Amino acid sequence: MRFRARVSQSTAKCVVFTGGGTGGHIFPGIAVFQALAQQAAVRVVWIGAARGADRSIVESAGLEFCGITAGKWRRYASVRNFFDVFRVLVGTVQSYCILRALRPQALFSKGGFVSVPPCIAAWLLRIPVVTHESDISPGLATRINARFADRILVSYPHTSCYFPRARRAAVHCTGNPVRQDFFSAQAERAYQFLRIDQKKPLLTVLGGSSGARDLNARVLSCSTFLTERFYLVHQFGAGNEDQMHTITNSLSVNARHAYMSFPFIQAHLPDILAASALVLSRAGANAVWECAVLGKPMILFPLERGSSRGDQIENAEYFSAHGAACILRAQDEKGHQLVSLLTELFHPSCARIEEMARASYTLGIGNAAYDIAQQLQTFIKEGM
């Protein structure tokens, strides 16, 4: 199998990372890898799903990658749950072989269904397990992994109450890790990349790594208003090109220079957010914490419970309760509330957006990636 060729190296220090299924489980792990690489000469190998985008994202960040068979336990009745039990078993055996060959000092899990087999295998091999949860309420994978973890890291102080009392001594609050690029972001680079001036404020719309069709539809419904008042950067998501073309075609020729669309923004995202006066976004953990690190006010459009387990609603409510964000729900299909809210926030006499920016910055203070790397360092030193 492919992973055998990738684990033949030997090293005095090694840490294995795991997580995947979506970018939300990978990018924070990459942030921790970057911080760890600055602190120590450690070999890092990532165990992720053999199928999907895990490999390309991880390898593009400079990490070794080992793919395993991944199963997923769904919260609803499905015949696929039966077959995925066997996929998890296969993935556990594969993970066991990888970890036995590598003999790492620790395993760091960033969650997602693919992380469960490596955590089980590490526990069987008595390799210390450190797991991190980005959302307020832990997902199913984190709840399972926590049973095998020596240390449970969380992003919000009150997340500890979701774990059994016997496990709470192992819980530590670190915040959510974001890439080091966000700490050195420069607005001027964004203006140069986008080829825009500063005559109008920049508004950035983020729909997550796969985009958000309903959020795109709201942009379409008020595209003329948005491009008249703002420069608009729109991450519309791969596969949603039809909506992007519809938005572009709805604009006058003169207005199109104010609309800049991308299927996905990665390398330039920190600079673009640094230049943004306001961010319209889903309420995924990565998005809200990346905005907070840069002190950006947010209008959040969380996924409803019918489309998720409710984690985005919880994230949005937390940032809203602390004054860093406003929430717009699915009922605002035509964008009327969005137009009204933007008009209010950017009225010359309104100080609310500055207050939101200060609140966002306060929440984003700290460097979770560095703190988590420090936690991993304790296991590396103990394992020497």
Swiss-Prot record:
Q: Which Pfam families match?
A: Glyco_tran_28_C, Glyco_transf_28
Q: Which family does it belong to?
A: Belongs to the glycosyltransferase 28 family. MurG subfamily.
Q: Which gene encodes it?
A: murG
**What are the protein's GO molecular function terms?**
UDP-N-acetyl-D-glucosamine:N-acetylmuramoyl-L-alanyl-D-glutamyl-meso-2,6-diaminopimelyl-D-alanyl-D-alanine-diphosphoundecaprenol 4-beta-N-acetylglucosaminlytransferase activity; undecaprenyldiphospho-muramoylpentapeptide beta-N-acetylglucosaminyltransferase activity
Q: What is the topology of this protein in the membrane according to its UniProt annotation? A: Peripheral membrane protein
| InterPro entries on file | GlcNAc_MurG (IPR006009), Glyco_trans_28_C (IPR007235), GlycoTrans_28_N (IPR004276)
What PANTHER family does the entry give? Answer: UDP-N-ACETYLGLUCOSAMINE--N-ACETYLMURAMYL-(PENTAPEPTIDE) PYROPHOSPHORYL-UNDECAPRENOL N-ACETYLGLUCOSAMINE TRANSFERASE, UDP-N-ACETYLGLUCOSAMINE--N-ACETYLMURAMYL-(PENTAPEPTIDE) PYROPHOSPHORYL-UNDECAPRENOL N-ACETYLGLUCOSAMINE TRANSFERASE 1
Q: What is its main location?
A: membrane
Q: What is known about what this protein does?
A: Cell wall formation. Catalyzes the transfer of a GlcNAc subunit on undecaprenyl-pyrophosphoryl-MurNAc-pentapeptide (lipid intermediate I) to form undecaprenyl-pyrophosphoryl-MurNAc-(pentapeptide)GlcNAc (lipid intermediate II).
Source organism (scientific name): Treponema pallidum (strain Nichols)
Entry's EC annotation: 2.4.1.227
Annotated Gene3D superfamilies: Glycogen Phosphorylase B
Q: Know the name of this protein?
A: UDP-N-acetylglucosamine--N-acetylmuramyl-(pentapeptide) pyrophosphoryl-undecaprenol N-acetylglucosamine transferase
